[in-house]
């Protein structure tokens, strides 16, 4: 777990906020405050109000943390407009405690260095921070790499007995030094995720078939965002047409399969 100082203030110094990073998961003050509020209230909606977030932003934050950390920090189920019940796990409690201790230590350390630095630490850290528009991001462990002169097939554990395969260039695999046991981030845009109804044909060119249960569906006039629970605190989100969501009768509780082409899986190092 690494710690960085977050965002600079108007005086050019680092603001007193720490971002914890573990396997690519960014845990800033806002998300840690959200975790603490969930622990106090037992509700995502109540916690969101307490820290000044929308319910959607809070729920997305919980999903992101659970997907990117080794163990879920919150066990929760969305409850529509009324919000849902939520329980802070032991892993979540440890993260809050670690954040408090590291924040105090980093604040003391950086305050002693800022006066002698010739550049703004906040500016440097902002430049080094990874940001991605991919809706789905998971921390995975590589268990197999098969490469030829052009391409490499990388197989990873997604959790709960489910695997994910990515096909990348052989050069990228070599530069990333991917091997069994490597930890990577797997990124997939939500519009690259297809959802299938019952009876998925065996003969499909789509390599990845991830089983899950619908836990949330948000409808817009033309599109729908559907989130599946994959087990183990992991989720996957797909953006499909609203007509497709209605045709497949995708509502909370329905079991379905997410289909992802291996070429649509992007890998990054944590």
UniProtKB/Swiss-Prot annotation:
Which UniProt key words apply to this protein? Molybdenum, Repeat, Transport
Q: Name one GO molecular function term.
A: molybdenum ion binding
Q: Which source organism?
A: Rhodobacter capsulatus (Rhodopseudomonas capsulata)
Q: Please verify whether the record's keywords include DNA damage.
A: no
- GO BP term (any one): molybdate ion transport
Report what the protein is called. Answer: Molybdenum-pterin-binding protein MopB
Q: Which residues form the Mop domain?
A: 131-197, 203-269
Family annotation (InterPro entries): Mo/tungstate-bd_C_term_dom (IPR008995), ModE (IPR016462), ModE-bd_N (IPR003725), Molybdate_resp_trans_reg (IPR051815), Mop_domain (IPR004606), Transp-assoc_OB_typ1 (IPR005116), Tscrpt_reg_HTH_LysR (IPR000847), WH-like_DNA-bd_sf (IPR036388)
The entry assigns this protein to a family as follows: Belongs to the ModE family.
